[in-house]
């Protein structure tokens, strides 16, 4: 077996990392010599392939001169190495022992035959050596000619073999990425000290060797099997090339499309380091709006440094021309919102047409709540996510919550049924998430309390413990006041935000309603004392219903302990620290995100025929489209073309329906007859605020979420993540190999048949 040395009376295992083990050679003549010297009768009837695959000899059975250590990480066996050091007698001292390996007893005739065979082989090798020297002396010009031919040939045999070898390594890495197999195998603390265990990459490599892949088998035939075949450094270099080549396939399509938008998702943990996922939106050659994941940006705490690195990565590393960027959006939690706003403003300074917008995948109310710079709001949002995740851990927990809802809503069964359906979804991302939370709060508290205090021991200690922690969090008066204030403040933006994620006509008309929304919020701010009094009363009544004590936050009480002059009431405290900053921030955030340019762009949606119809074809796109004039192929004919576009749809046939989305308009058979309209629709389509109509082309974000959900934090890799998320993108193995050779190896460094490469031990 591969785990044990095949030599008689040798009990060494290949899991010993301090001792090299070698495969039996596949060459029949050499393999036969190894078998004869081993004196193993049970090995004589096995083929060289079987011996190579299943049997090993440790380095103790070879002369020291036969083993080469070209570096601390390279151990190779010479091509002519034959094992000669064996212990064939120690078992005689213990005749009752049961040996796994039977030693063959040789007769005197067999011994004489072996000796004569060795003498004949030695004389034969000497004769061949003399003939070779004579031939070289007589034909020196032939050697010169061969050297000239090698210069003419594009690749030597060694170079071709090296390329095939590298191609096999790249195939394994791509497979691991697509199937989400981590590079590392067992955890370091799982492996006993002194034992060698191959990582997942080497395990797949050995599998291909044992399956008969000639290139790999030839490369590692004389290599110690209990050492790493490919170093961590080489794996990292190759993964970077895989990532770059696969990303380039997407970036090539983006460049062909010219215009694009940049979107970042919430900060994620990749092997202990914070990264920003970056996605790109563009319209491909088939007129489909696509949103693709293109990589991670290491997060920086300093906003200015982050802005510089973000710009550098997009323009220099990825080669995108930001002059063609028409939109930017950032989905981040409250702790990172202010920093990403700095990034957006720095990009806008350099590229005014890269409009800062909301992202269609995030509800406006949740986006606004995450951006509020109040610690209590951040804590509340985190608690809400944890509660939702807790109940989605198992169907039994959701069923328990359903039962509590049924009891509480006995008199309103329809509403109870609706709430159950909502609880089974990811409701924390809804526009009305805070309304739902306030309505469900009693059910959540009772359910969590019941799970924690269950006497039937239906839940394990972890579930019961988490229920206790979450119950304490949602039963805190600070949490209750926070969600009630958010519910009421964001009620003014709920309809507006919902329309932004609706049909194209809804988005168009929403742009015109922003003024009314801001007017309402400003009125709230002017009368904040009155509004806050109502909000605080609602929070107090809810706390009383749940038997929760009304009190100031513990951190405030501790800070003012012993201060007799502090007569601040709970109501006034929450007005100054929660209600006022929340309303002020939301007003300012709406003004920032819906800039004049952004609103002008949304007004251009009147180009969509269904919107034209609702406006009775009395539209004025030309005025709003001035900001995109430089993007048009024929700007001088825009006015006439828009007139023809309106006439086309105004006088259409009765059986022809008006296209209701940009997606439908872009796929019209005659859209190319309106080149300016086509260009405008493409630019509007890629704005992050616009919904991706065909879900087939929104895979980047979904696959990113799936990768993060299914992969442990310490096993995540930014390189492998890109391969996994973009598993359907074509890849050019030859390009990857050529790139690797160009970057990391020179012609003189390519390994030959006489210097087999083995990597880190």
Curated annotation (Swiss-Prot):
The cellular component terms of Gene Ontology attached to this UniProt record, alphabetical and capped at eight, are:
nucleus
Positions carrying Phosphoserine are: 566
- Pfam families in alphabetical order: Dimer_Tnp_hAT (PF05699), DUF4371 (PF14291), THAP (PF05485)
The biological process GO terms on file are: negative regulation of cell population proliferation; signal transduction
Which segments does the record annotate as THAP-type zinc fingers? 1-86
Keywords (A to Z) from UniProt: DNA-binding, Metal-binding, Phosphoprotein, Zinc, Zinc-finger
Kindly list the GO molecular function terms attached to this UniProt entry: DNA binding; protein dimerization activity; zinc ion binding
Which residue windows does the record flag with biased composition (Basic and acidic residues)?
Answer: 116-132
Which domain of life does the protein's organism represent?
Eukaryota
- Residue segments, region Disordered: 116-149
Its assembly, as annotated, is:
Interacts with DNAJC3, probably sequestring it.
Q: What does this protein do?
A: Upstream regulator of interferon-induced serine/threonine protein kinase R (PKR). May block the PKR-inhibitory function of DNAJC3, resulting in restoration of kinase activity and suppression of cell growth.
This chain belongs to which protein, by name? 52 kDa repressor of the inhibitor of the protein kinase
* Natural source organism: Homo sapiens
């Amino acid at each position: 077996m591969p785990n044990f040395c095949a030599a008689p009376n040798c009990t060494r295992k290949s899991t010993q990392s301090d001792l090299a083990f070698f495969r039996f050679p596949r060459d029949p003549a050499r393999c036969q010599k190894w078998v004869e010297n081993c004196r193993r009768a049970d090995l004589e009837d096995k083929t060289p392939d079987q011996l190579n695959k299943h049997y090993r000899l440790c380095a103790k059975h070879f002369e020291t001169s036969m083993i080469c250590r070209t570096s601390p990480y390279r151990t190779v066996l010479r091509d002519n190495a034959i094992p000669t050091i064996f212990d064939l007698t120690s078992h005689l001292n213990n005749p009752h022992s049961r040996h796994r390996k039977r030693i063959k007893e040789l007769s005197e005739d067999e011994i004489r035959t072996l000796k004569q065979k060795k003498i004949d082989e030695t004389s034969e090798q000497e004769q061949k050596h003399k003939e070779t020297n004579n031939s070289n002396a007589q034909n020196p010009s032939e050697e010169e000619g061969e050297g000239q031919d090698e210069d003419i040939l594009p690749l030597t045999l060694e170079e071709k073999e090296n390329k095939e070898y590298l191609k096999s390594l790249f195939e394994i890495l791509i497979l691991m990425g697509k199937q989400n197999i981590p590079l590392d195998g067992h955890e370091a603390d799982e492996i006993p000290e002194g034992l060698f265990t191959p990582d997942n990459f080497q395990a797949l490599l050995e599998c291909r060797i044992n399956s008969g892949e000639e290139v790999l088998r030839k490369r590692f035939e004389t290599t110690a099997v209990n050492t790493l075949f490919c170093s961590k450094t080489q794996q990292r270099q190759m993964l970077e090339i895989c990532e770059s080549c696969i990303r380039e396939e997407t970036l090539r399509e983006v460049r062909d499309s010219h215009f694009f938008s940049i979107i970042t998702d919430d900060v994620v943990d990749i092997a202990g380091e914070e990264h920003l996922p970056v996605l790109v939106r563009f319209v491909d050659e088939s007129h489909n709006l696509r949103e693709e994941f293109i990589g991670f940006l290491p997060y920086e705490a300093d906003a200015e440094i982050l802005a510089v690195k973000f710009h550098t990565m997009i323009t220099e590393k990825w080669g995108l021309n930001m002059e063609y960027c028409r939109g930017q959006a950032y989905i981040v939690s409250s702790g990172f919102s202010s920093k990403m706003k700095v990034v957006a403003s720095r990009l806008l300074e350099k590229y005014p047409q890269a409009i800062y917008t909301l992202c269609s995948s995030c509800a406006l109310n949740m986006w606004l709540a995450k951006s509020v710079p109040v610690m209590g709001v951040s804590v509340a949002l985190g608690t809400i996510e944890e509660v939702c995740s807790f109940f989605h851990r198992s169907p039994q927990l959701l069923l328990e919550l359903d039962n509590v809802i049924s009891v509480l809503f006995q008199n309103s069964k329809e509403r109870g049924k609706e709430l159950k359906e909502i609880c089974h979804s990811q409701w924390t991302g809804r526009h009305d998430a805070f309304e739902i939370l306030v309505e469900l709060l009693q059910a959540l508290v009772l359910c969590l309390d019941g799970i924690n205090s269950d006497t039937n021991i239906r839940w394990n200690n972890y579930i019961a413990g988490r229920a206790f922690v979450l119950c304490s969090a949602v039963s805190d008066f600070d949490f209750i006041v926070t969600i009630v204030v958010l519910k009421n403040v964001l009620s003014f933006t709920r309809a507006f935000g919902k329309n932004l994620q609706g049909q194209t006509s809804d988005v168009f008309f929403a742009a015109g309603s922003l003024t009314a929304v801001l007017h309402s919020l400003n009125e709230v701010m002017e009368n904040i004392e009155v509004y806050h009094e109502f909000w605080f009363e609602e929070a107090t009544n809810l706390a009383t219903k749940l038997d929760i004590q009304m009190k100031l936050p513990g951190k405030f009480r501790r800070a003012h302990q012993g201060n007799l002059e502090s007569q601040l009431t709970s109501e006034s405290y929450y007005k100054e620290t929660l209600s006022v900053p929340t309303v002020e921030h939301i007003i300012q955030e709406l003004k920032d995100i819906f800039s004049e340019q952004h609103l002008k762009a949304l007004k251009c949606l009147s180009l969509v025929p269904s919107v034209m119809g609702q406006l009775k074809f009395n539209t004025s796109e030309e005025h709003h489209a001035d900001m995109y004039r430089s993007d048009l192929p024929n700007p001088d004919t825009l006015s006439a073309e828009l007139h023809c576009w309106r006439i086309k749809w105004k006088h259409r046939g009765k059986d022809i329906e008006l296209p209701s989305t940009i997606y439908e308009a872009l796929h019209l058979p005659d859209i190319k007859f309106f080149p300016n309209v086509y260009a405008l629709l493409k630019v509007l389509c890629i704005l992050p605020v616009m919904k991706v109509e065909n879900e087939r082309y929104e895979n980047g974000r979904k696959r990113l979420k799936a990768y993060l959900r299914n992969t442990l934090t310490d096993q995540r890799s930014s390189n492998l993540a890109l391969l996994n998320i973009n598993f359907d993108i074509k890849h050019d193995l030859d390009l990857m190999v050529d790139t690797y050779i160009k970057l990391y190896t020179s012609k003189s460094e390519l390994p030959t048949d006489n210097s087999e490469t083995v990597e880190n031990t």
